[in-house]
Amino acid sequence: KNACNSRTHLYYPKAFNYCKEYGLTYMGNTDIHGVYKQTYRTDKQSGPMTIVFAKERSQEGVKEALFAGRSVVKFGDILIGSEKNLLSLVKACLSYEVKEVKGNQALVKVTNKSTLNFEILLDNKAGTILGNATVEIKVRLDDKVKFTTTHITDDSRLVIDIASLR
C-alpha cells in the first residue's frame, strides 16, 4: 500500500521520513534474488545505489561519511537524502551563470556537469536539466526552483531560491 513504483521496481517513501525524523543515514540497496543484469538493464539504468560524500577515498573515509550521515540514494532518476546533502549534490553538479538582469528578471545559464538528470518546477512550469548539458532559463529573481525528483521526505522536495544563485 505504501510502495511506489519506479520503472517497475518498488521503493518505500515512508522510509525517507524515518531517516529524517531519527537522523538515520540514507542507504540504497536491493533485494535481488536473481541475476542483476536481468533485473536492471545495465545499459539503460542502474539499480539503487548510495552516493557517499567521503572526505577521502578510503575504507575509513567511507565509513566516517556513512556514520556522519553524508549520503544520498539514487534510485532510477530519483535522488533521496537530507536537504543538506541534496543541496550539496545539486551544487556540485550544476553551475550557474547569470547572463543578464533586467529589473526582477534574469537569464541564467545552467550547466549540468554530471550524468544525472534533474527534473525541476519553476514558476509552475516543468522542465529537465539533462546530464552533461547546458540550458538557459528565464527566471524572476524572487522565484524558487523545486527539484521534483529529489525526496527529503515522502512529500518534501529540495527547493532553492533563485536569489541565492547570484
Name each model feature, range by range.
Residues K1-R166:
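Charged catalytic cores and adjacent phosphate/nucleic-acid-binding surfaces used
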